[in-house]
Amino acid sequence: MGTTTMGVKLDDATRERIKSAATRIDRTPHWLIKQAIFSYLEQLENSDTLPELPALLSGAANESDEAPTPAEEPHQPFLDFAEQILPQSVSRAAITAAYRRPETEAVSMLLEQARLPQPVAEQAHKLAYQLADKLRNQKNASGRAGMVQGLLQEFSLSSQEGVALMCLAEALLRIPDKATRDALIRDKISNGNWQSHIGRSPSLFVNAATWGLLFTGKLVSTHNEASLSRSLNRIIGKSGEPLIRKGVDMAMRLMGEQFVTGETIAEALANARKLEEKGFRYSYDMLGEAALTAADAQAYMVSYQQAIHAIGKASNGRGIYEGPGISIKLSALHPRYSRAQYDRVMEELYPRLKSLTLLARQYDIGINIDAEESDRLEISLDLLEKLCFEPELAGWNGIGFVIQAYQKRCPLVIDYLIDLATRSRRRLMIRLVKGAYWDSEIKRAQMDGLEGYPVYTRKVYTDVSYLACAKKLLAVPNLIYPQFATHNAHTLAAIYQLAGQNYYPGQYEFQCLHGMGEPLYEQVTGKVADGKLNRPCRIYAPVGTHETLLAYLVRRLLENGANTSFVNRIADTSLPLDELVADPVTAVEKLAQQEGQTGLPHPKIPLPRDLYGHGRDNSAGLDLANEHRLASLSSALLNSALQKWQALPMLEQPVAAGEMSPVINPAEPKDIVGYVREATPREVEQALESAVNNAPIWFATPPAERAAILHRAAVLMESQMQQLIGILVREAGKTFSNAIAEVREAVDFLHYYAGQVRDDFANETHRPLGPVVCISPWNFPLAIFTGQIAAALAAGNSVLAKPAEQTPLIAAQGIAILLEAGVPPGVVQLLPGRGETVGAQLTGDDRVRGVMFTGSTEVATLLQRNIASRLDAQGRPIPLIAETGGMNAMIVDSSALTEQVVVDVLASAFDSAGQRCSALRVLCLQDEIADHTLKMLRGAMAECRMGNPGRLTTDIGPVIDSEAKANIERHIQTMRSKGRPVFQAVRENSEDAREWQSGTFVAPTLIELDDFAELQKEVFGPVLHVVRYNRNQLPELIEQINASGYGLTLGVHTRIDETIAQVTGSAHVGNLYVNRNMVGAVVGVQPFGGEGLSGTGPKAGGPLYLYRLLANRPESALAVTLARQDAKYPVDAQLKAALTQPLNALREWAANRPELQALCTQYGELAQAGTQRLLPGPTGERNTWTLLPRERVLCIADDEQDALTQLAAVLAVGSQVLWPDDALHRQLVKALPSAVSERIQLAKAENITAQPFDAVIFHGDSDQLRALCEAVAARDGTIVSVQGFARGESNILLERLYIERSLSVNTAAAGGNASLMTIG
């Protein structure tokens, strides 16, 4: 959309008045001026007289209308953002205000509007009962429709078999290779209890299908992939496997055909004639996913154009009401249809919409703009507004728009549409639907921490909303042609009665979905003389190939299979019809009586804030599609940019400013964000003294009080979110969505660790380490910085924080918040500076009792070597908690949905300009789908916008500095010179291109490799490597990933559970993600941290982390923490039983050693290895946290009792033991039972540290321990933790012997959230 700058001269007094007024309403002066112009114009356009203005300045008439020639102005941060804020009319502002209105408020307002007058209510109930009775008792539909309906009712989504059918339907038809298709069929069918369905259905087809599935299931359930082919051939001859594949394929296609009118528009028009003769009308929908590339959007545009020509010719002049129409999805017409890309939508999508509408007008067929996700509603209204005022469309009433009754904004949208119809002098076609994205709306609000849901959480509230909205639509027949889309007999009957008996053609119509609503509407469409209601019904008819059908089909399966749907309940003969056709207003009032309040949300759907239960708040997010939130953010950002940000050393006593260095915005060198001064050696020394002196004071503070201070810090941080976003965007180059996520993560850390110490810690028993150094990275300069400090403070330690050199300003704000919350100044101190100076002085000091570090593997290794020779007062090694990088891979097989893969790859590889430890570095694509996936991925990359993150439109910001840019570009050039195909793409834009020259930008890059092993080290930036693999070589691929030595994150996209189990079971990786992106781990939901070269553990935001920051604690402490968590969520301890069998053998052997036997029992009870826990999280996601044994533990002792103590501890967790090959240990191995000795490996004592092991337990004196620590730290590769004890001690920390694995599965990946849809 083109823009023009118009200048106006104002005196200082007026300018100040504008500024003051804008500040008062939390808006920018720029917004206020724009809004004033907009409101005045609206008033002028809506009335014949000119609204009177207050007296203007006398000199106003002499002012020039021309804009003054702009002078070269200094860079003003966030001015672009402010200019992207849209003014709103009163009716549009009311829509935005109702976006996430509390349900109690929204439902209370609707009830009276929805209530039917008593006589109408009685008539509606009577008619609904008749319709439902006929529907239930009519002969089962014959042919394909009856077969499919029978299948769907028998296999509901609450059964494992129903979900299996849904997964099959979603994926089977798109898989190109037979091997993967067979694997999917085997996977979904082999575990089902098909036998329980035999004979339950009256339909012969369902019973035949069940026998077939049972037969198939029995064939495959006892065989794994390798032996399946042989077994099948043995049982049913050589044609067996193709026979099963063909049978299931046919069943899936049958289901597909039930819901699709035709594969082409010509076929669909031909198939429609039969029902058109019965009085039905049609609106055709061209199937497909939302466009991700320009090519996709162009293909959909052509498809729509061809369809309009075909429908128009078939309509043959019948007009918009009597003839067929078309429905279009705006997300199909543009790859970036979102609020953030507003200008592109208006400049590129709108002309396509206009062109299609003009084509529809040419044939006089109705064109409906389909409703989509809630964050697209208001931009779709802007497009509609523009369309309604096109001169070429004046006087034509074929423009249609779809509204969703489940949205709280719906009644206000109707008010706006009525106003729009009035202003544009036309009658609009408005289709009222209940809404098809309910489960994903719930999930998104929970994940984003928004203040509420845009939709109702109870179906009955949507039914009430539908009636209230229907009454509004029927009230203005001259302005609105209502189209009521419903399959619910009561809703249908209520509208029939409300609309009155004197129906006239063109008054209104009903609508239903092809393949779902015809049995109901055959009673409605037709003459009264034939016992029908003589009301028109238009069938919403999808058109497309079986491959394009998938996403649509799954939505239909979800709707039909959900036990709350009318279509599902009508078939359930145990449900009384009176209950089925109950008035929703009455149902809501009954609920209110039971619950004591009207409109309470569904008890099983907590508000986003309460997602984790009452013990911990979910951090609040910020909705970047909400115009009011954007305006408020814009005001705060402009204010933030005026602040003079500084980062000085923050010690117990204030320090002098001294000579400062500028902190430069990496996207814009002209923007000086603030100033920093490095801590001097003297200041570092002072800080160390203060940390030592204040440590006892802070430790003496009760845990509940420490927790309260951290909670206060979280609240303060959340209240300052907008200001913090401003610094993160300018100092760290974060986009707005990234900056919001960063503040939220910091808040989550504060809440999480505070909750743990409040509930589980006591000062008498949980003793801290002492002064702890926290060295944080620039890529998460607030989240990781706060997480480290919050954990150390929660555990009772004093903290010396050294932020990254590039990002000291946001760190200073973080410390200021902690101090304001009540942390004493000497307990937490900030020491800005370089690692080589400030970092080295801090970590090299003997008074430091622990080091927390996030950064490169190389620096972590140096730190470990630096502290290896130091022991604390108790003679224990100084702990290093290091979280380092990874060579993170994503494995994609041919059953994955390409569109989903591409969206997740873009987020995982290029979000934050690839500057996340967790970012995707190597994409592994199965051969059969590699070309197709890469084509779409390249197209999607070309749609990304790279530029200054201070604009809402930016997807990819800068890399952190010129050194990072040079390193990344060097790698890309090296790959080019090796002949590797390199693809770089980003959306070309002259404004962005100017910034690319001055800022430190690297375009998203795709590099194809021959082999995974070609990549030798992590490339920290927006560079994605691609390797192809053969399906049969998946085990070798996983071995290659493990061989890299890194183990931070790994993604897998597949619909096959066997593949998921194979990958997650054999990959040595800390955080695993299935069918979702692999970045953005959430505190307490996906505890984060790697293994091998990727980190030491424990995982940040997990239950073990705080225990690493204690010097002493009860041996049962961790068990207490886990038991509290286990009270809410089940524990799977199947693996534990298998792991502890050698321990049981040792316990029996120790019958004459009561002390050892007691230790075996104690360790066995406390051991948690082999346990898996479900963690809280958003709906549509399953998050588990598993504790596994470390592979091999080096145990060193010179006393038999200590050696056996170590052995008992290691066997309790299920690890192998590495012993020195000396007389003591050889003798023990001979004496031990074979079940135990099998777990022990001996190695020569002189080079034992050269052997592979991943943990160490030592008993002996401090000099020996020091030497051992130094020898272990000197090794290359993984940093290994050493536990050191005096002879005779038995308090071995079992959690140091665990590997933690987080697994996050997107359970809604197959197209919808079955468990949420069935909660009632």
Curated annotation (Swiss-Prot):
GO terms for molecular function: 1-pyrroline-5-carboxylate dehydrogenase activity; cis-regulatory region sequence-specific DNA binding; DNA binding; DNA-binding transcription repressor activity; flavin adenine dinucleotide binding; identical protein binding; proline dehydrogenase activity; protein homodimerization activity. Pathway: Amino-acid degradation; L-proline degradation into L-glutamate; L-glutamate from L-proline: step 1/2; Amino-acid degradation; L-proline degradation into L-glutamate; L-glutamate from L-proline: step 2/2. Its EC number is 1.5.5.2, 1.2.1.88. Its cofactor is FAD. It comes from the Bacteria. The keyword Magnesium does not apply. Residues 653-1119 are annotated as: Aldehyde dehydrogenase. PANTHER family: DELTA-1-PYRROLINE-5-CARBOXYLATE DEHYDROGENASE 1, ISOFORM A-RELATED (PTHR42862), DELTA-1-PYRROLINE-5-CARBOXYLATE DEHYDROGENASE 2, ISOFORM A-RELATED (PTHR42862:SF1). Homodimer. This is Bifunctional protein PutA. It comes from Escherichia coli (strain K12). The gene is putA.
